[in-house]
Regions:
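C-terminal lobe/tail of nucleotide-utilizing enzymes
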Residues: 1-50, 194-227
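Generic detector of well-ordered alpha-helical packing
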Residues: 7, 99-101, 160, 185, ...
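Short coil/loop residues immediately preceding or within conserved phosphate-binding loops
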Residues: 61
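Conserved beta-strand position immediately N-terminal to the Walker
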Residues: 64
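Active-site signature of alpha/beta-hydrolase-fold catalytic machinery across serine-
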Residues: 81, 85
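Conserved Switch II/interswitch segment of TRAFAC-class P-loop GTPases
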Residues: 163-164, 176-193
Length: 227
C-alpha cells in the first residue's frame, strides 16, 4: 500500500474515518442486541456473487457500487457480506466504503481489528447520520477521494443510497467500474424495479449484476432483461 494511504486517512478524518476491521463481521440483532455471525450466513451464495461480479469477465472491476432500489432492501448487509467474503479470498487490500451518509450502518457490522490480525479488510465509514445538505457535501468529497482509493486498494466496494430515492448511486457509479443492484425479494414492486433500471440505463452505467436479498444470489441475465 502506497504512502497515499495516509493521505486518504487524513482527508477522510473529518467526514469519513478509515478503520482496519476484522474479516469476521457481525450483524446487530434488533431483538436482543447481540451480533449475528455473517460468516455462517449464505456463504456459498455470496461466493457465487463475488465470482460473478469480480472474476467472471476479462477485466476485474476495481470500484463497484452497491445500491438498492428503495429503502429497506438490505443493500448495506449485502455489500458488507460481499466485502467480507472477497477479502477472505484475496490477499490484496479491500476497502468497504460507507456512502449512504443519510443512513449509515456499516460501522455496526464490523469490529475494529486487533493488533497482530492479518485482516486485509478496511472500512471507510461515517457513524453519524447526516442531513441532506451535509450528505451532499460528503458525497462530493467522497467522489474526489476515489482516485486515491484506487491507488491504495485492489478492490473498493461502495454502499450507496437507493437508486429511486437519491442520485448518489448513479453519480458514484459514473466514476466506478459498475453497479450491483439490490432487489428485495417478494417486496420490491415491478414498477420500482423498472424505474431504477431506466435510470441506470439512461446514465450509461455498467450493470454488473442484480441480487435478490434474502436469497442473495445473482439474477441470471436472461431474467434481469425481463424486469
Amino acid at each position: 500500500m502506497s504512502t497515499n494511504f495516509e493521505i486518504v486517512r487524513r482527508q477522510a478524518n473529518q467526514d469519513l474515518e478509515l478503520f482496519h476491521v476484522a474479516e469476521r463481521a457481525v450483524v446487530p440483532s434488533r431483538a436482543n442486541g447481540r451480533g449475528i455471525d455473517l460468516h455462517k450466513l449464505t456463504h456459498e451464495e455470496t461466493i457465487k456473487l463475488v465470482r460473478r461480479v469480480f472474476f467472471s469477465g476479462a477485466t476485474t472491476p476495481q470500484v463497484v457500487v452497491f445500491s438498492g432500489i428503495e429503502h429497506g432492501s438490505g443493500c448495506s448487509w449485502v455489500c458488507a457480506r460481499t466485502a467480507q467474503v472477497l477479502a477472505a479470498h484475496v490477499e490484496s487490500p479491500v476497502c468497504l466504503v460507507e456512502a449512504n451518509l443519510r443512513f449509515p450502518s456499516l460501522h455496526r457490522y464490523f469490529e475494529t481489528v486487533v493488533p497482530g490480525d492479518a485482516s486485509n479488510l478496511w472500512l471507510l465509514s461515517h457513524g453519524a447520520k447526516q442531513a441532506d445538505r451535509q450528505a451532499t457535501a460528503g458525497l462530493d468529497r467522497l467522489q474526489s477521494q476515489v482516485s486515491d482509493l484506487r491507488a491504495n486498494f485492489a478492490h473498493i466496494l461502495i454502499d450507496a443510497p437507493p437508486i429511486n430515492a437519491y442520485a448518489d448511486a448513479v453519480l458514484l457509479a459514473g466514476i466506478a467500474d459498475g453497479l450491483v443492484m439490490i432487489v428485495e425479494a417478494n417486496n420490491t414492486p415491478r414498477e420500482a424495479a423498472m424505474r431504477a433500471k431506466e435510470v441506470v440505463d439512461a446514465a450509461g452505467i455498467r450493470l454488473l449484476g442484480a441480487v435478490l436479498n434474502k436469497r442473495t444470489f445473482p439474477i441470471p441475465e436472461r431474467l434481469y432483461r425481463k424486469l
